[in-house]
Amino acid sequence: MKIIEVDEELYQYIAAQTQSIGESASDILRRLLNLPTHATSSVDFFESVASAETPKSAVHAEPVLTEKTTEVSQPKVEPVEPPKAVKKQSDEAINHIVDKVRALLNSAEFKEEPKAVVRFLSILRTLYRTNPESFAQATESLQGRTRVYFARDEGTLLVAGNHTKPKQIPDTPYWVITNTNSGRKMLMLEGAMQSMHLPEYLIDEVRPYFVSN
């Protein structure tokens, strides 16, 4: 195995290409290079990037190139747990959440809010307060074996280090990591909303507020 040093600009570019929580660094590079998919166990790049906020990106948790320029390998880290089954909400409950989220998106306060992290927490707050049970099931379904995104106390998230920057979701018992860019915050929202069986059109209405940076 050979290790190469990846500069910060290239590292952040690769990170910004993540399209789903379960996508690995190998998947991303193969897609960018138009190479066929490679059915091997790989690291969840969403997890590895979210936990890496260092000036230098040449660390062992990152992808390393082998002698073949078309192959990418990762450290042996357990993959993300497959999403757990979440109880389907009634149409009435789903419509109620849709109305509440839309009301938030259309509010002047939300539209004028310049910070992505505040918008992120506001949407999570609305999802929880509209249906706490469904929100709880959704957050549990998003947990990985080696990465925790939501917890009921700050300490659980700090186990991975202070760099996770956990913040409490206002008016809820939940905490969430915030050391992610806008694009990855949207991936977390999308995962939660899909697990709560919310319609894709609502997710698409949320997406413009979290453009990857």
UniProtKB/Swiss-Prot annotation:
Residues 116-117, 145-149, 179-185 are annotated as: Interaction with DNA. It comes from the Bacteria. The keyword Cell division does not apply. GO terms for biological process: negative regulation of DNA-templated DNA replication initiation; regulation of DNA-templated transcription. GO terms for molecular function: DNA binding. It is found in: Cytoplasm. SUPFAM superfamilies: Replication modulator SeqA, C-terminal DNA-binding domain, Ribbon-helix-helix. Keywords: Cytoplasm, DNA replication inhibitor, DNA-binding. GO terms for cellular component: cytoplasm. Belongs to the SeqA family. Negative regulator of replication initiation, which contributes to regulation of DNA replication and ensures that replication initiation occurs exactly once per chromosome per cell cycle. Binds to pairs of hemimethylated GATC sequences in the oriC region, thus preventing assembly of replication proteins and re-initiation at newly replicated origins. Repression is relieved when the region becomes fully methylated. Homodimer. Polymerizes to form helical filaments. This is Negative modulator of initiation of replication. It comes from Haemophilus parainfluenzae (strain T3T1).
